[in-house]
UniProtKB/Swiss-Prot annotation:
InterPro entries named among the record's database cross-references: ATPase_NBD (IPR043129), Glucokinase (IPR003836)
GO BP terms: glycolytic process
Protein name: Glucokinase
GN (gene name): glk
Membrane-spanning intervals of the chain: none
The species this protein was found in: Synechocystis sp. (strain ATCC 27184 / PCC 6803 / Kazusa)
Annotated family: Belongs to the bacterial glucokinase family.
Catalytic activity: D-glucose + ATP = D-glucose 6-phosphate + ADP + H(+)
Entry's EC annotation: 2.7.1.2
Signal peptide coordinates: none
Pfam families according to UniProt: Glucokinase (PF02685)
NCBIfam families: glk (TIGR00749), PRK00292.1-2 (NF001415)
Compartment list: Cytoplasm
MF terms in GO: ATP binding; D-glucose binding; glucokinase activity
Length: 355
């Protein structure tokens, strides 16, 4: 594939912050080589009018720290937004990015833009055992498909297919917009509550399995069981509800609910996370049934690493495995949680090396 120690520029671009990294990959290694970071820096995205001056500053800083300018073979940037024909207009930032324009202005032979969750798909390939927690151990087939889903602000899904000779291809998915399928009387009541709240005829799984989903589940439960709500959470909820349409917020209800469930200090929070984890696991199982990911199913996103003890308690894996006649099949699929918060940045580097 090329000489040893080829250098790439990788970036994880968000509306608030951008992480840039100069990485090297030994392309002569057999199989997929993991990227090694030479220099990394985090910037405030709104502080720059465009990505170009940010990258120029980054390269100057890298040259100063490393002692000399480093040539870059290719670049790949993971972006929180839709990427069409290697272009993207960021939702929360007045940037319109084009891979061709960036390549020309930065004097880099090739610049690829990819969606941030597609970057997570590539990033899985660059992780080590220290970056993962096992929820279900099973033999991994190196030639098998890999499935990834991750709840955070929304619910991302994608899958990875090996192409042979240490190369992989990531495919995006909009599976999170599939229907939420209730499995219990309480989940049916949750569905009807959300349909009425949003004036919709259907509810997507993302409205339940996401950070906002946790908040909505708690809101539903306090509506169903007002006598179970503690005075502390009643006050938190009222503040959150008052501020939710404001730019400045002082309460993150989803974080408060999950933390209380971790500490076992609130009955309604415990129940909310049980509902959330059951639905999360069920959707992970649905994805696994569709893809049969013998290469593993990975739970990514911002929520999972923060609630490992809850994931290990059983509701998630019970929802995953409870597939009727297919239950024994579900036990053959490796399931792991991604702990490394920089998986998207790693993925951008892996993508650059493969493109």
């Amino acid at each position: 594939m090329g000489a040893m120690g080829v250098n790439f520029l990788a970036g994880d671009i968000g509306g608030t912050k951008t992480i840039l990294a100069l990485v090297t990959i030994n392309e002569s290694s057999p199989g997929l080589a993991r990227p090694v970071t030479l220099f990394e820096q985090t910037y405030s995205s709104p502080a720059f009018p465009d990505l170009v001056p940010m990258v120029q500053q980054f390269r100057q800083e890298a040259a100063f720290v490393l002692g000399n300018p480093i040539s870059v073979a290719k670049a790949c940037f993971a972006i929180a937004g839709p990427v069409i024909d290697n272009t993207c207009r960021l939702t929360n930032l007045d940037w319109h990015l084009s891979g061709d324009r960036l390549a020309q202005e930065l004097a880099i032979a090739q610049v690829d833009l990819i969606n941030d969750f597609a970057a997570v798909g590539y990033g899985i390939l660059g992780l080590g055992s220290e970056d993962l927690t096992v929820l279900q151990a099973a033999p991994v087939d190196p030639s098998g498909a890999i499935a990834i889903l991750g709840a955070g602000t929304g619910l991302g899904q994608c899958y990875v297919i090996p192409q042979g000779q240490g190369r992989y291809r990531v495919f995006a998915s909009e599976g999170a917009h599939g229907d939420f399928a209730p499995r219990s009387p309480l989940e049916w009541q949750l569905l009807e509550y959300l349909k009425k709240k949003y004036s919709l005829g259907r509810i997507s799984i993302e409205r339940v399995v996401s950070g906002m989903g946790i908040a909505m589940i708690y809101e539903f439960l306090r509506h169903q069981y007002p006598e179970r709500e503690s005075a502390q959470f009643s006050k938190l909820y009222q503040t959150w509800n008052r501020e939710k349409d404001q730019e400045t917020k002082t309460v993150d209800l989803a974080a408060a609910v999950s933390q209380a469930a971790l500490e076992g200090t609130d009955v309604l929070a415990d129940q909310a996370m049980e509902l959330f984890l059951g639905a999360y696991g069920a959707e992970a199982g649905n994805l696994a049934l569709k893809l049969l990911p013998r290469g593993g199913l990975y739970v990514a996103g911002g929520i999972a690493p923060k609630i490992i003890p809850l994931l290990e308690k059983g509701s998630f894996m019970q929802g995953f495995s409870d597939k009727g006649r297919m239950q024994s099949l579900m036990g053959t699929i490796p399931v792991q949680v991604v702990l490394n918060a920089k998986v998207g940045l790693i993925g951008a580097a892996v993508c650059a090396a493969q493109s």
